A protein has these predicted regions:
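Conserved SAM-binding loop of SAM-dependent methyltransferases across substrates and taxa
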Residues: 35-46
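A short acidic, Gly/Pro-enriched loop at the edge of an enzyme's catalytic core
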Residues: 84-96
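Short, glycine-/aromatic-enriched active-site segment of Class I SAM-dependent methyltransferases
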Residues: 133-151
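Conserved beta-strand signature within the Rossmann-like core of class I S-adenosyl-L-methionine
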Residues: 124-132
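Conserved Class I S-adenosyl-L-methionine-dependent methyltransferase catalytic core
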Residues: 1-19, 23
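Conserved SAM-binding strand-loop segment of SAM-dependent methyltransferases
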Residues: 71-83
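A short glycine-rich, Lys/Arg-flanked "PGG" loop and its adjoining helix->strand segment in the class I
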Residues: 111-124
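Conserved class I S-adenosyl-L-methionine
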Residues: 25-34
Length: 169
């Protein structure tokens, strides 16, 4: 309640990392890794081997700098990659996380996104998907679609659960 916005973000990442049940040496993929905070925390606290993917050249460059500045080159990598290219990458991960990225995928691509995750998740692996949800399926507010999630939408929990069932998540 009295936390700063920064502390609330730190708390959210800590909570997500606990939910992933990470163990030293595990592999973790962050789809839409942003500036790398989640993976940096995971590497520091759990000694995992993490990969982040992003479409942003600015985030890619800054995350690479942070990896080097914090001496985490043996633990972390970041790639400029679209999630749709993951299946042909040959990668396999113990854990996959995506925080606040699904909204940008767009309703027509939810199943493709989940199919891509299913193909790179090791048997017995764990996938944590964090997204903003709506109560019902709807096309969305034009302003939000233009300025917040261009090309995307806010999904309902029901539609994501239905898509997840297709991949046995």
């Amino acid at each position: 309640e009295d936390d700063t916005l920064y502390q609330a973000q730190v708390n959210k990442v800590d909570y997500i990392l606990k939910k992933l049940h990470l163990e030293e040496g595990m592999s973790l993929l962050d789809i839409g890794c942003g500036w790398g905070f989640l993976l940096i925390e995971a590497a520091r606290k759990y000694k995992i081997h993490g990969t982040g993917i992003t479409l942003s050249h600015e985030q890619y460059a800054e995350f690479q700098k942070r990896i080097k500045d914090q001496g985490l080159e043996d633990y972390l990598t970041v790639e400029l990659m679209d999630y749709r290219d993951l299946p042909k990458s040959g990668y396999q991960f113990d854990r996959v996380v995506s925080v606040g990225m699904l909204e940008h995928v767009g309703r027509d691509n939810y199943q493709l996104f989940l199919d891509c995750v299913e193909k790179i998740l090791k048997p017995g692996g764990l996938f944590l998907l964090h997204f903003i949800s709506a109560l019902k399926e709807h096309p969305g507010d034009p302003w939000v679609k233009k300025y917040i999630f261009p090309g995307g939408t806010v999904p309902s929990l029901r539609e994501i659960l239905n898509h997840m069932a297709e991949d046995n998540f």
